[in-house]
């Protein structure tokens, strides 16, 4: 009820004919509107770790409802575009793919991605839920990386990313958020 873009990364066929496992990764949008029933469902689903990729401005406006729950480890690892690149984007001098590349390739971006994967590697129990504000850009990047590492074909990765556009097409407030 309280999210519009929460889904499991399980069930994708890999290049070697196997499938990604369910209950390992959930991608999501902001969790600040979760109902008590939503929280119970997520706990039953096996959520043990939450990775919040929103920046300080976003987290200060709306705290992650899962961040203070017993039995759930919460990490805030912001993925943010560098100011120069964001200015170029807003002035039409680059496109969104340039922003994504800068978030992963700049020195700070590389460190952030490394930190994300260190957390993922260290959390061996339960499901990991990761999110940003809309579950679109930053969440899409991490989903793409995880599915790619699992050997999911590119078309399915693109299809997974594109689902958000069907979910938000009527919501004019949803946009790139950072």
Question: What is each PLM-predicted segment?
Answer:
Residues 1-129, 141-178:
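Cys-dependent protein tyrosine phosphatase-like superfamily
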Residues 134, 138-139:
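Ser/Thr-glycine-rich phosphate-binding loops at phosphate-binding pockets of nucleotides
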